[in-house]
């Protein structure tokens, strides 16, 4: 999942971004509303952590523009991060399109829990554990299991599997995976996605269990619930 942190306090922005990256998310940072809108115009984000009080374009206006952008469907989830704690401020943020509202100062574990909760809404689940076939992913404890056996995954492999499991059965192009699992510093001209999918696929191969990730020729990859290729899908 790819996140955008919009915060004009540099130390706080970097601390939040570092914590989110340590949890396996791809994170970009914007220091003000104008930079945030520039990044939102070029990149697809799953969630935006958005400060309200910023010089120039404030967070409320950024949120309104996110919600008015009809070219993004779905538009990213928005988590407001602000020192404004009055009822009126919270209502204004939610009415302008925020999905959740967290008052500063906050404990990072709570921020992380709220991020997971918002992203679960798009995955259609109410718990921190994702399940596809005999594959289980505990996003809170960072534990991946298949057929009751623990899988040793790197942070990027875990993030990639999490994205697959929140989009089961969907064909995901390399461009889509690069956009949502890697940050803006990833080189789009490398074979990073193909290599990471390949290593993840090998780690998911437990015993005689069927392969869960198919290559759909000319289109991308798909996580199936039984490992059977569909249509023009062929394993690679």
Predicted regions and their residues:
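A short linear beta-strand->loop->alpha-helix hinge motif most characteristic
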Residues: 211-236
């Amino acid at each position: 999942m790819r996140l955008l942190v919009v915060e004009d306090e540099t130390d706080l922005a970097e601390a939040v971004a570092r914590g989110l990256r340590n949890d396996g998310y791809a994170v970009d940072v914007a220091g003000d509303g104008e930079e945030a809108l520039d990044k939102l115009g070029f990149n697809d984000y799953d969630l935006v952590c958005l400060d309200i009080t910023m010089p120039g374009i404030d967070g409320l206006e950024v949120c309104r523009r996110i919600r008015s952008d009809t070219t993004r469907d779905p538009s990213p989830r928005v988590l407001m991060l602000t020192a404004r704690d009055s009822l009126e401020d919270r209502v204004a943020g939610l009415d302008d399109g925020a999905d959740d509202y967290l008052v500063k100062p906050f404990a990072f574990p709570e921020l992380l829990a709220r991020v997971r909760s918002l992203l679960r809404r798009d995955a259609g689940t109410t718990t921190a554990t994702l399940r596809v076939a005999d594959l289980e992913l505990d996003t809170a404890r960072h534990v991946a299991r298949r057929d009751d056996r623990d899988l040793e995954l790197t942070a990027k492999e875990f993030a990639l599997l999490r994205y697959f499991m929140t989009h089961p059965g969907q064909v995901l192009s390399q461009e889509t995976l690069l956009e949502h699992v890697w940050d803006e510093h990833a080189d789009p001209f490398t074979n990073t996605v193909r290599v990471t999918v390949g290593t993840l696929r090998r780690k998911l191969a437990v015993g005689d269990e069927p392969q869960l990730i198919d290559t759909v020729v000319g289109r991308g990859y798909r996580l199936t619930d039984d490992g059977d290729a569909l249509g023009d899908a062929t394993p690679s």
